[in-house]
């Protein structure tokens, strides 16, 4: 906890983001969520003092998970492969592409002071899919803009980190929101 505020890692994986958060803040991640038992087992090994939820992020109730504690930082690393140009021309999965909406759920229910979402740069082109499950080029960015608008409507000031992160030869960007 940072000054009594929880740190939450959604889509926690093996714990890389949690380790980075801990190194940057000097505080341990309090809650980690991931649907994959192997990822949660690795996260538990790397972060034994964290409360772990091995569940779909949509199945975890933010209010219950936080148990009345305020949230200082909510971190989100939703699956990026359905946005990445590295994926190629394969059809996209609407449900996977929609995982980022869980950040708005947390924003609306527990009002984290800071929300950070990490994804590939193509995330900004998030838009509807056609019947063949391919992005509709003329509607690129529409869903992303709705997502950002919803966070703004919830009282968050949105921005993007000035520098891009390079990971496995793919550029990633951090989108952040701070409560006004």
Model-derived regions, located:
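Extreme N-terminal starter segment of soluble prokaryotic enzymes
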Residues: 2-7
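Class I SAM-dependent methyltransferase "Motif I" SAM/SAH-binding loop
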Residues: 10-15
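A short, Lys/Arg-enriched amphipathic alpha-helix followed by its capping loop at the start of a domain
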Residues: 20-28, 46
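The conserved SAM/SAH-binding core of class I Rossmann-like methyltransferase domains
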Residues: 33
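Conserved SAM/SAH-binding beta-strand->alpha-helix loop
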Residues: 36
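S-adenosyl-L-methionine
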Residues: 40-68
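Class I S-adenosyl-L-methionine
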Residues: 62-73, 80-180
